[in-house]
Amino acid sequence: MDLKKLDTATQPSASPRALISYSHDSKGHSKQVLDLANQLRADGIDCRIDQYISNPSEGWPLWMDKQVEESDFVLIVFTERYTERSQQGRKSGVRFESVLMLQELYEAGMINDKFIPIVFEQKNSQHIHKWLKPYSYYVLESTAGYESLRRRLMDDPAVEMPALGPPPTKKGPIQP
């Protein structure tokens, strides 16, 4: 049985695919990430996290590379620890993921629709990587923050632009 075909066959084609990149700061933080992933899946977003996989046969680095490449979006949960682990010279999964993401962003000419910074608390916004600071980030302290993120992932703006009306008719020159 081809598990890849089975996996994609069960997913609606309109569902965006998202990966969550995060550091295992604590059990509580990992639970927040799991809850977020579960909620996104419940809302029709094909969300992937490492917690859903016990042992990828290709190994963690190749699994992560594949997830980053195949995802429509990568949600990056910034904390102080995430940023520390991503620093040059560190040997960690977060460092590896950061390099993959930065390289993809570089190759796209820094045009970014894919890599989305998120924080569970506003205070962690100071830890967003400088190469992601020019882009919108989402604070998930409230339902409104989550809803904004969900709408972005589903390409469902909160305010729809109205249709453009006809141009004004020319009235001719002004008569003296």
Name every feature range the model reports, one short phrase each.
Residues 35-65, 80-90, 94:
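Conserved BB-loop
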Residues 61, 95-99, 143-147:
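Amphipathic alpha-helical transducer elements in NTP-driven molecular machines
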Residues 96-113:
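Arginine/glycine-rich "motif VI" loop of SF2 helicases in the C-terminal RecA-like domain
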Residues 71:
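An anion/phosphate-binding loop that grips the pyrophosphate of nucleotide cofactors and donors
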Residues 5-6, 60-63, 103-104:
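A generic local structural motif
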Residues 1-18, 22-42, 87, 111-176:
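C-terminal interaction surface of TIR/SEFIR-family domains
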